[in-house]
Each structure stands twice: as C-alpha cells, then as structure tokens.
Amino acid sequence: MNNTIRKIAIVAFLTFGCFSASAAEAFTASTNIPEAQYPKVDTDRCAHFRIHAPEARDVKVDICGTKYDMTRDADGWWSAVTQPLVVGFHYYFLVVDGVSVIDPASEAFYGCGRMSGGIEIPEDAETAAYYTFNKDIPHGQVRECRYYSDIENAQRRCFVYTPAEYETRTDRRYPVLYLQHGMGEDERGWHQQGRMADILDNQIAAGKCVPMIVVMDYGNCGYIFGARPGETRADFGATFTPIMINELIPFIEKNFRALTDRDNRAMAGLSWGGHETFQTTLYNLDKFSHIGSFSGALFFLADGIDKAYNGVFTDADNFNKRVHTFFLGMGTEEGFGSDRISKALTDAGINNTYFASQGTHHEWLTWRRCLNEFLPLIFKQ
C-alpha cells in the first residue's frame, strides 16, 4: 500500500466524541452520516471540521474552492473552523497531502463532476420551513426507476416523485414537471441537495400548488464543461433532448398515471438544466406549456432575441397564448443575467415572471427558492 493510499485510509478513521469547548457549543451538521459528531455548525454559521490523520503532513478543507488550513494536535487529530458561511448547502472536500478526498463523516453527494462531501448551513426554522420535513402532513414517495435508451444503447435512471394521494386516488391522473439538475450534477441532485420532495409535500398540503408528478433524469451534463476535447457549448448536454422527447416522456406516461396533453406538462431546470429546458421546450412547444429557468445558462441575447430558438419570440401574441407559465429566477449575488433576459422578453411583449432570490449566489438555496416560487404558478389553467 503506497503512502497516499495509506493516508486516505487513515482519513477514513472517524471520531464520534466532542473535542473542544468551541466545537461543543456547535451542533452536528444534518448532512453527516449517522452517529458522526463532526462536521459541526455553530450559531455564527462557522463550520467545524475534525479528522484523524496522524501520518499526514498537510490537511485542508476545500469548500467550493475556498481552502482552510487544518491544524494538527499531538495525537494526530486535524481541526479547522471556517469563517461564517452563507446559509444553504455547500459541497466540500478534504485535501490530504494534495489528494482531494471525501470526508468520511459526510454523506456523499454528486456535485462538481464527482462524488463530494456536503454540509448544510441552516437558516432559521421559520425561513427554512418550506423545505423542511413536516411530520404532521402527508408525504409523497420518490421512486428510483430504470429504463432502456435505444438512443444511447444503455440503461438510464430517473427519480420520480408522486404526491401522497397518488396511492389512494387511483382514479386520478396528474400533471408532470420534468425537473433538471445543473452542470457537474446528476439526477439525484434535486431530491438530495434540493429537498424537492419536502418542498412539494409542504406546498401540496397547504394548497399552494396542485398535486403533481415530478421527474428528475440525468441531463448528460454531469461532468464539467471542457473536460472532453473538442466539445463545444452547443454539444454540451445536447444529447438529452432527444432522449427526453422520444424515450423519457413515453416511459413516464406508460408507467405512471400522467396527464399527457401539453397543458399538463412542464419543464424547469437550474443552471445548465435551465439551458436544457429552453433547448427542449422552445423547440417543442407542441409538448410543453410551462417553462422555468433557475439561474439558467442562457446565451441567446448575444444574437438578438428575434433570432433565438428559430424565432419563437417574434410573435409575442402567439407565444403568450401557448405558454401559460414562463419563469426566470436567480440569486441577487450571481451574474447569470436572468434579470436582463426577463427585461428583454418583457420589452418584446413576452409575458414572463421574474424572481430574485435575495442575498444568494449560484447555489442550492437559490434553486430551492426558485422551485418554491415556480410551483404555485403551474398547472393552474
């Protein structure tokens, strides 16, 4: 066993005790594996990390590119406390002598083009209530489904949310929202990092949105753009649209009690998933009437709004009749330009709803908020 492998193995040795007064005043992160006491989060929103790696020479915590040096005690325990972090979900890694590894005390999440650790910095209970599990309401189910793609000549996987009443109201069919992840993530993102099931359960129970089926599939963009030689922006994730139109939608409508008309079909996505949403829906308006982009990677303004998507925006009256919901949202601290796009669409006579998530960046808290705003708008016709 070489030294690097030995060091990674050492990192896998956890402690479940409390080691310092400052850490004892913090609480265990909700994203930890069962029984693990670290990482912790204190009331100042600082994260506390601790790992046993007695043979390591240098250990850092890497949170979305910001690195914190860890200090070693005499027994080989390394610890670090971060600066206050913004509320919400953060991907992170441990860097042990230059090798980036997942903290074995964290649940694993697919993000940044690989499996990673994650830590949730909580909001206050009232603010976070919309994405928090509520024991006093009915809960839907999330199924893992597999189907075969003739286009890819491979098995694919999707996750499907059904509302709580789906099992008992067997005479009812439901509208369907196809909900896409972003670059470097996969079909697990909305269920795990995005807390979509809690958001849906809470809204349905409160009567804020209609009961619906939600489908989360892999958008063929789970790696970081530029990793494949010669790939252009137009190529990135482009193979997903034909799979969705020709294989995923028929699979869902065959296996679930789904309404099959365009008025009861929606698509939304975050970041590159927003890009895929526009690429899929705006070229297939015979199939979709509700569209949402959450911090969407949208570039069409550069060529003029009248040329975008085969000129779909040139006849505003026709577009407004066909598209019942056209939603754009983003965080106020990011620069993805959804505000400029919304204004350009409005100036062109295109009805749209713009939402600004106050104080958030290109992150899961922005997208949870966007989903929470989008859901009450759809399927209301």
Predicted segments — roles?
Residues A21-T28:
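Boundary at the C-terminal end of the N-terminal hydrophobic targeting segment
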Residues F27, V41-Y68, R72-Q381:
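Non-catalytic cap/lid and distal C-terminal segments of serine-dependent acyl enzymes
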Residues A36-K40:
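Short beta-strand segments of immunoglobulin-like
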